[in-house]
Amino acid sequence: MQASDRFNINSQLEHLQAKYVGTGHADLSRFEWTVNIQRDSYASYIGHYPMLSYFAIAENESIGRERYNFMQKMLLPCGLPPEREDE
């Protein structure tokens, strides 16, 4: 692999990380990674009507109520963030 290839790959990766929030970066904590996964999952459930219907039937709720519940869960999907240790 040549130096120009490595530069091209790194610049493409930086572009993706700047464009899409969930792609992560080197300083991403475990909590932030988990939050991204949970939010992506909830967004997928809301966006795919059959999956949303499945959850609504399983929980005996209306589809609108399930959509609302999932959007509320997207705010803090994993609870409050842990305390940061200042260095």
UniProtKB/Swiss-Prot annotation:
GO terms for biological process: mRNA splicing, via spliceosome. It comes from the Eukaryota. Pfam families: SF3b10. Signal peptide: none annotated. PANTHER family: SPLICING FACTOR 3B SUBUNIT 5, SPLICING FACTOR SUBUNIT. Was originally fused with At3g23315 to form At3g23320. Belongs to the SF3B5 family. This is Uncharacterized protein At3g23325. It comes from Arabidopsis thaliana (Mouse-ear cress). The lineage of its organism: Eukaryota, Viridiplantae, Streptophyta, Embryophyta, Tracheophyta.
